[in-house]
């Protein structure tokens, strides 16, 4: 693993009196794509929401680029360099594609790749063809691409993706994998929550498996491939 960008130790999270995460610890290196795998209800989404300070109560240590961010509000976490793409996409349905992208625009960070509408349209050619279409007239896959592109307009250093392949046609999933690998090539780090092991294998350097709000496994994709008993125990439907 390259130099650590995100270092999470002992992350706990609650919704009311219900505890959802139990001491989640993980690391992500610069320019690395890491998968957080698990079934529905395992704690994947809550992990991302806890990292973004979007859960009612949390505890533990979260360091980003060597800076403690555990106590920061969400907008300060975004300003520090984390971008979040939720599962429900949240496009602005009355705005055009171009207008949605402008909503997310932030100044570039020194020494990092600069994301503009032009290079995002090259990354997602379908969006270029519908730049004047409103978000409400787009398919689920098109909305997913738009949400990722809008997040990149915020010039993040690390992108958190929640189930980016869920419910999408195979061709769109393939385009999504290509986009994530292009993000990595541009120097971004990515933490992607997934149930689709095939998709995760195509894009990830390493993987964690979460079950019952606890990390049960960590290793490279090759190591996970060599341990079918792990896949059967935690990922089989």
Q: Which stretches of residues belong to each language-model region?
A:
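ABC-type ATPase nucleotide-binding domains, specifically the catalytic core motifs of the NBD
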Residues: 16, 72, 97-115, 123-128, ...
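The feature captures the beta-strand-to-loop junction immediately N-terminal to the Walker
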Residues: 37-39
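Helix-to-loop junction immediately C-terminal to a conserved catalytic motif
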Residues: 52
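Conserved ABC transporter NBD signature motif
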Residues: 60-68, 80, 113-117
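ABC ATPase C-loop
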Residues: 151-152
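Catalytic Walker B motif of ABC-type/P-loop ATPase nucleotide-binding domains
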Residues: 159-163
